[in-house]
Amino acid sequence: MARINTLYMIKNAGSGHIGTSFSSIDIVSWLYLNELQKPESSIYFSSKGHDVPALYSVLISLELLEFDLIHKLRKIDGLPGHPDIKIPFMHINSGSLGMGISKAKGMVIANRLKDKKQNIFVLTGDGELQEGQIWESLQSASNNEMSEITVFVDHNKVQSDYQVSKTSDLGDIESKFKAFGWNVIRCDGNDFISISDSLNQSSNISNRLPTVIIADTIKGKGVSFMEHTAITDKSRYMYHSGAPTNQQYIEASDELISAQNILLNKLGEPELNFQEVPLTPLQVSTDKKISLMKSYSDALIDQADKNPNIVAMDADLILDSGLIPFKESFPDRYFQCGIAEQDMVSQAGGMALNGLLPVVNSFACFLSDRPNEQIYNNATEKTKIIYVGGLAGVIPGGTGHSHQSVRDIAALNGIPDFIMIEPYNEVEVQAALDFCVNNWESSSYIRLTPLPCTLSVDYEVSDLHIGKGTTLVDGDDIVLFSYGPNTLEQAVQASQILKLKDISLKVINLPWLNFVDINWLKSVTEKVSHIVTLDNHYRIGGQGDYLASKFINFKDSKKIQFLKLGLDNIPECGTNEEVLRAHRMDADNLAIDIENFFNGSNI
């Protein structure tokens, strides 16, 4: 049943992680049915986090979460796309990989100081074992005899879209864990008897060392065409993330229901009875949508054709980074680094020192933060590296705050001689990459949104003029600066709302996140006294802060009224529309706040 409900939750949400949810669900089910009856004495959490639909499904089945939440995965005020401690039985926030064992160690220390006895079960992924923090966390757990910790490795052999062995082979992981002083047990993680035997074996160990149970599992277990064993070793696994098509959903549901009913018949129990829920139809727009990732992918190949020193790197995100065409075109110049961002960035540093031009790709949230020190170190060597951060900004909102990159501008702002750009449309993506490759002498950061977008105002630009922007909507009363298609589209729509109220809002696309041409800035604002900035980022540390620091030096700065819009709180999880509305970044709320600002009211 838990797999059936998990499948429904992901289909209804429109996105999620089926493969890892299905590989881990038997482990989670067994733990909750047999080991976790008393939360004060035993707890469980997932370090990898993206398997959380399976955990939600188990908790709902045991009536530990309200049943109606089954309809609210990745919805506002519902169940986040990655674990969040605001939800009952979520003991840590996860989604950013590698932190779970360290969190468990901290809990053990706190429990010991408070004379509290509690067993802690942690689930990690096998791809997650490529993160350096995992290995940093092991030795002291053994040295301090933290037998309270039992780690399950969901060893489903596939990370994201490809086999672990083809991405960054783990080698003999049993010997590796033993070398760090851990007890090591192996089991079939999709077989209850094997899981039970491994836990019984663990409980009978007399030493005080922590234990790792390497659970061999099948990614997508339970649905034949979703199981990773159905693909060849060179094929891409198709069910890591996203949602199944209608036909895939019907076929998968039928297979799961049939298997469950066969078991119930053997037990003499009635077959399953289901409540039908209408499928929410997808809102398909007839408007032309732009794809910045597709444009980036094409532009990178074009630049690589001209420059043999360009190499591309990514951290287990070849599909999301748009690099499959690059790998096919330049197989010898593509480097898959696995889930190891710090190592990837330092490798890029070595490549740059020896004359290559690395283009380093990952999600913006992971690329800007985890290897931040390595990026700075590379910059001190005065080499040239291009960093490309995808999944930037507050939407898509379904993944939750671990993946919503809303502090990357601030995180990278202190890097010397470092330019940051967020393009607005497809042509500007090409121009941005061309600028970074051919016109900027040091390192750079291109910030990209993955969402196909519809733009009310579009334009073509042959090249970028550093520090200068483009007016999308002309206006006389207020000037608004922003960047990227998501916030600028909302700003353009807000200008149309304000026009009906006789407020004229000029909307300017300024793709330069940490640089502005002062003379240009003066020229576009000289006739207004009200300035607004809109960041797809926290207000602190974003483009708005940078521009405010420039306006302070203007001779007539005391006459300028300045409003910074953006995020103040941890990003909400939900649909894109829900998330923008929750943070007052949608057109309607922007229009209200800008009108109040113009009229002298507090917002």
Q: Each PLM stretch: what is its role?
A:
Residues 47, 123, 152, 313, ...:
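Short hydrophobic segments within beta-strands
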Residues 129:
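Short active-site segment of divalent metal-dependent hydrolases/proteases
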Residues 126:
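Residue(s) in the substrate-gating loop at a strand-loop-helix junction
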Residues 1-121, 261-447, 452-453, 463, ...:
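Thiamine diphosphate
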